[in-house]
Amino acid sequence: GGSTLGTQTIYEFFKDIVKKDFVFIDNLTQKKLNTKKNRSVNLVVSKSGNTIETVVNSNIYIRRKDANIFITENNDNYLLKLANKLKAEIVHHNNYIGGRYSVLSEVGMLPAELMGLDANKFRQLNSLIKNKHFINSLVSGVSSTLNYIKNKKYNSIILNYDEKSENLFKWYQQLVAESLGKKSKGLLPIVSNMPKDNHSVMQLYLDGFKNNFYTFFYTNELKSETLKSSQILSSQKFLRGKNLSNIMYAQKIGTENILNKKKIPFRSFE
């Protein structure tokens, strides 16, 4: 949840300049991890200190001789007791910062510092508030979403054409679901990784029930792989000279055109 998704997003965006390798264990898994134990640190994060998945993974992966850091609340919880037993480093999580916002607390900022990033640069709220374009975009986005809800469109579907943003939208999914899913109300956030999902759920999006609204997301990847033109057969010669980013953009435009023809509401960010 909030104890890892924000941090994963930070790492994904900055990993080209981060000199350390980070492995995120955010679920119960049977897979074995290949880490250099003598050169690794276990960072165990849980606000409550009693999250079952974190407790189980801690039992499987960490040992007393490891370098261990625990981030949890300062109360009578399981992970705090374990940290004391292991004589591990302990960072107390401030209990007035909720899980949805914890990326700006020690939960997100300590990992950011370990990545070699400056935590202070993540806290630029004042500059955002003073940015009229940001505020206007925020108001416009909220207004359009409320309009969709009034028209009984409760499924917010992200059509994501940017591989680097996958963790960002997993985080978005968690934030929207936990923030708005209350009192029998809310939005159902669904993330589709495109263009792969053209061959799975797109049929439902186009011709299924009509309580969805869509958001396209695309970024132009400057270092995109270029196809080997000499190996493209003549039947698909339109692909010659194209790179992956060109192709994905063309597919995005094509999908938007289809939604327009079917009068299906969407917004698009590039």
Where are the language model's segments positioned?
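A short, structural micro-pattern
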Residues: 101-104, 210, 263
